[in-house]
């Protein structure tokens, strides 16, 4: 790192190279041809994300070769099974970026949806180009609208092929998103550049050709700046396969340039970028010149032996042309970066060419050195040239020739002895004999392009002597910014780390200058006032931690539509304080501004005002006036010298004099005379007047005062206040009078009645004293507070200033005028804010929300720092600051560039395999694919492929979390496939699931028809033939044509069915029994029933699902049939989850298309099996279709239990508790706590009428119990202690829980009529070690309440005081949490939609193939099931931790019977491609952390990316029977094991940290005191980790798993579950819940289902109250009304509530369109900046209409470009 000094260099002229510099005589050369490289950046394999890291890799000869990430080729495995064979033969090794898919789309205002359609080459190029500009010290925004050029090498279209060949999912923006031109064009678009923007495809020479184009653009004057580079990304195997076949790829996947073993190259990926300027311009702009490009050339090698064969003569020609352009003698070039692709033909050819140019006539001891970067980072093809260029620059800069990597034996086909060139084989200092370091760079394309460039080091004599600013003196401003607020802390963290490491010795002022003048200032800003280097790191740390700091400002700039111009407001009397000028008079700018006025004023008053500032002697009003003016003049000078300029000014009272000076209406000397001579006259009236501030508007105050002249409104301060002035006695009386009216008044510290008729006597003397005409020109807008019209242009002459003394100060009018003119930023220029409050009031009264009022100084605060703080506040609100004026010195290079906030973005390809034939037409709602006759028979088969993308129904039809084809779809398939009108004996055997791709056949053989399928394997090693065919549904069909059927009298049926149901009865019924969604869109619009029959009017219009009409084949009977089978299942009196199992007969009586509106007549016909008949009727009653004897089977599960995920997975919410009508009597409180201070503190909060007793231990309490009043009205408050560290948690938890158990036992065994209240401290927040230590008490309290109801509660408090009111009024709750002063109780509720993760981010709790996944309890039943699930989801490496070890593998075939299932399971996992490691370790032991860490190192597995803590011990005992040892035997392992894992894998170190907890303590399972306590600890630990930023920390609070684990279902467990009103879950349901919770950012998930109860029946446990299903046979009128209005949010009518409601809804719509979270949508950001393009605008408009039910014009977002604007528009519409 170094600093760059400002310099000047004469325009034009020749290069002043020293006479003894060789090379300049090679040809005539003009200095104006020199092109400077002023910035560079790169991102390549091996974690080399910047040039400095790359340099270290070069020096250490690192080779970044590795295997291709598994995700890259995965779509090709799925697309066609034949690919697997080819991919196995394709080279999979190369040089790959760690996470090519990562992109910071928010930084660039690109939505995740659009980013997914962009080639990763565009994404990485955007980021690298931005980094290069930052490295150059060029703010990107400064280039907006400029002629800056972008030339970029690109020639890989892998991603384009990947996404565009997925035809069903092609989208509009994929064209530009995957085009070559999109790479440079995207950079130009983002930066708003107007210069050339061109993609260069010259194969492997592309990026060096791009550099050449950039050089040419600058030399020809097309562009002042050029951004050039190249990129390569390997997203598919196609080209690699081509190169394999051509023999160009190295078999071992590595480059070996110049080596005898070189037999092909290895492909690499990444990007590099350079920023170019003319050298002359770079010097004028004080840029850091990294290197100088002297010359470059591009040519073609003509017709060679083959188009891909190299040509040495052409390579030499290109090099000589570049040298000639450069005016450089080749003998002066010390190093050449060779192309060197490691091919047997290419390397010798290239070396001969280099030797022919650079090696000729060179002495053996003075060779030209050569090297190649490719063995380090691979061959980047289109990006290769620029990376070689970057290496050459680094070599010149560092003065070291880095050694060649992967070099063992020099290529024997090259004559090295006579070549005159030498490969660098060890790090070699650049020869000191070279007067200037020069290098050449070669790059060639396999199509024949040859390119060459010549560069040299920057000659420092071109720059004048550097200016040495020296160490920073005094405080300075450190600026950070980002497009989103969350970036500020990250940027602060990155900068602090750099300043304490690489940048620890750098000049602070240079760092500040760089951040202020050489970096962009985004909308979210932070400005830190710092004293020195150490202070800067500390303040940065505070910002990174989210800690407030007194001199740190952080805010968003004012909205895009709001003016950022600043109004300076100069306040009047009242801001003074004794030391206000003592520091400032040492400021040279301040002193220079006031010093000329000192002599003038001293001549008038006989005293030096500067001396008065030194002494702080200005108690009298006349001195205050003079010094107020002087301070304001000095402060104005300081502000202006710091780059702050007012666009308008306002003066308040005496402040109007300084305001006029700044505006140009007065000179500072004239202002000094006015204020001084006026102050001298004030001596005549000092001590006679008084002033008070009145909390009433001026008009109302005037009305009260009447027409009095001795008492007037002197100052109109704000819309709600004014100042009254007059005789001091009258003012005092008036204050009392106002007080009597209930009006607040405040005395103003003044003994003069300013701005009142009292001063009329001074007007003539003032005219005489001033005695001269003043008629200046105003050059800054000046609002008057002395005139009725604040915009009045009255000349500031003698009359004006005379009137100013006595006229009312109309501050409110002046501020209102400024607001009307668009101003929103106000700076009070004073020594303490006097009018800021009034300005704020006025702005708020105007209905403004986006504004700022900023003080310049604060009383008794450091003046220099506070002035900077005010500038910081202005900057952070968007004011223009001339930072160059404030920081004109040197700037520093090497500061960290933008810290990206990456998210993985990769287009998921769902295209069906090519081998499956034609796919069925989903719009016809059948499974009929390609029709294939069977030769020689009348049999034919329809073949197709079924998966989630080809499901033949538009909605969703899940059963226990698995999507299945509805029965209606299968019946429709049979009808369409046979062409018949009648089906008989339809048997629905096995549901057709679509959770995995499957081949489907519909077989029609004579009069039989069936649907069969088999799974398509995702394992490349398995053939589809290995899967078995499954028969799903069978039927017989009849060819006869049915005639018309009977007609049913609808009116008679309606009259007979007297009970009218709610329209949504069937949907609600189905949802409650587990059918959470419908496969087809239909809605019931009328519904009637009696005990055995139903009549329902059904609408099957596809628009039911939304505004977009679905693709719909009008001949499909499936939607009507779906309504029939669904409504037909709801006729039965008992609720259960039922599916059609058999239908005796299906008949269609019409050849016309099914109706959109029909009636369903349902008759129950049950015998031993639930059965119904369903007729489909026209609106006139004609029978169109009929289901006869549709028999239903009850699905495994519990009647009355909803099957949807929403009914399975819950959060714990904390709604306010309902107070009891009769309070609990509490007269005495016994405090038990080991903390004496806490006892005293809590006792002090009790009212005097409540007696208290204090004990330090339970034993102390028990021993004194006989002397205590243990009677009704007495309660025990148990207050556990606090802990300071995690190390103390296990012991403390054990102590706290056992103390509580002892208290309970004592009270129960003694039959004492007292209650126990346990008071924990903010356990719910989970932030502190104390919270963790106390958390087991939560679980214990719930179990105690279950076993001993009404014995008291646990109350989690937020303040250290006895919550007496809560103890008295909140009764019957086991655990109470006090939050925001409100007592709350726990309830299960649906997962909050606000926590739903954006679809683009994907789920968070699932594995990836490159990680290791650790499971404790790994050999247990649940542990192995978790392992199976993780492998199913892609995990390839498992580490199973268990207390027991497995025998050696060689003995596995002879293990005991009890181990055989475990061994078999592990072998099954391994057969599916997983590597399974078993680690015998007791995770609860004290040395577990050390043992686990050692084992992980020893195993050398890939990093652990996920942890599942599934270990545990269960030992049920009732509270009264448990012993301390037994209790601790369960609790200690839970806590110790979890803490051990927490220490080894701290927050954010793994993708997920899952802990298996239990719902037992939540619903109060008896006997689980210890188990429940331990699980409550796990729950809080998850919260603790989440508070530390770990988004993958989750505690699953499971119900029992059916047949599995410690809580597996048994008769006892089932009885306990039923008693608590819940059910168990199956293994599949459990993991479906896991995947559902993975979609949410939440630290816990309660997994259980509630049993249905009859309406009016009490809930088994209160926590279930909000999720329990209540059975209702029919709805009352009120219930129907409620049902009719359900689903609509209560919309506030007006005011802030409406705006908040609209803001939430509109941000939600925008987030849905952009596929991001609503929290990430900035209401004040332009929608276009967020990524909403013209296509998305259409979708957004539709979303807004659907959500807010208001027609939206197509042009709305044109005139309302932000969410805030849209809120205003919709608010107006709703208001009307």
UniProtKB/Swiss-Prot annotation:
Pathway: Mycotoxin biosynthesis; patulin biosynthesis. One of its GO terms (biological process) is fatty acid biosynthetic process. It holds the Pfam family Acyl_transf_1. It catalyses: 3 malonyl-CoA + acetyl-CoA + NADPH + 3 H(+) = 6-methylsalicylate + 3 CO2 + NADP(+) + 4 CoA + H2O. 6-methylsalicylic acid synthase; part of the gene cluster that mediates the biosynthesis of patulin, an acetate-derived tetraketide mycotoxin produced by several fungal species that shows antimicrobial properties against several bacteria. PatK catalyzes the first step of the pathway which is the synthesis of 6-methylsalicylic acid via condensation of 1 acetate and 3 malonate units. The pathway begins with the synthesis of 6-methylsalicylic acid by the polyketide synthase (PKS) patK via condensation of acetate and malonate units. InterPro entries: Ac_transferase_dom_sf (IPR001227), ACP-like_sf (IPR036736), Acyl_transferase_dom (IPR014043), Acyl_Trfase/lysoPLipase (IPR016035), Ketoacyl_synth_AS (IPR018201), Ketoacyl_synth_C (IPR014031), Ketoacyl_synth_N (IPR014030), Malonyl_transacylase_ACP-bd (IPR016036). Residues 1-26 are annotated as: Disordered. Residues 1-18 have a biased composition (Low complexity). This is 6-methylsalicylic acid synthase. Its main location: cytoplasm. Residues 925-1201 form the PKS/mFAS DH domain. Multidomain protein; including a starter unit:ACP transacylase (SAT) that selects the starter unit; a ketosynthase (KS) that catalyzes repeated decarboxylative condensation to elongate the polyketide backbone; a malonyl-CoA:ACP transacylase (MAT) that selects and transfers the extender unit malonyl-CoA; a product template (PT) domain that controls the immediate cyclization regioselectivity of the reactive polyketide backbone; and an acyl-carrier protein (ACP) that serves as the tether of the growing and completed polyketide via its phosphopantetheinyl arm. The keyword Transit peptide does not apply. Residues 32-457 form the Ketosynthase family 3 (KS3) domain.
